[in-house]
């Protein structure tokens, strides 16, 4: 989780250049407690933070003042964070965007990157991880976690990818995965976020 701690110093001049003079940061997340903690932590690291708790609010703020940096939750109460990414990219093509989610899969990560996100971080991500992702140089990757995905996680992400490709149609997804519809429904119910 995000802690209210002393800001991590930016140790390289090139990193400071990547943040640059425009320190505007839009954070879009429907988890109010997480949103406020992250906003405080990023302000402590030198950003001028604006927050939004919905897709509609995020798009409105992106249209009014497109930010130089953005941290966007993928799944919001009123839609997908991908819509906010598109709105920002439509107004400003140099925005450095990071997608956060507690319910991720490979297909949505690929979509987010195709739309212009720099990276895709799983929740809970701390402010230092987010800062590192925001200031990474082009072509540079933040170190991946040491623990590789389990076979169960790979299977789940494959199911999620096919489910998203089928526009969340359970019957079509079950056909494509060659499994019974009820089996798929049980898997989806078991792994659904609470």
Swiss-Prot record:
Residues modified as 4-aspartylphosphate: 73
Post-translation changes: Phosphorylated by ActS.
GO biological process, one term: phosphorelay signal transduction system
Matches recorded under InterPro entries: ActR_PrrA_rreg (IPR047772), Bact_response_regulator (IPR050595), CheY-like_superfamily (IPR011006), Sig_transdc_resp-reg_receiver (IPR001789)
Keywords carried by this UniProt record: DNA-binding, Phosphoprotein, Transcription, Transcription regulation, Two-component regulatory system
Domain Response regulatory residues, every copy: 24-138
Keyword Translocase among record annotations: no
Record-linked Gene3D superfamilies: 3.40.50.2300, Homeodomain-like
One Pfam family of this chain: Response_reg
GO terms assigned for molecular function: DNA binding
Record bears the keyword Transmembrane helix: no
Known role: Member of the two-component regulatory system ActS/ActR acting in acid tolerance. These data implicate that a two-component sensor may be involved in pH sensing and/or response.
Protein name in the entry: Acid tolerance regulatory protein ActR
Organism this protein belongs to: Sinorhizobium medicae (strain WSM419) (Ensifer medicae)
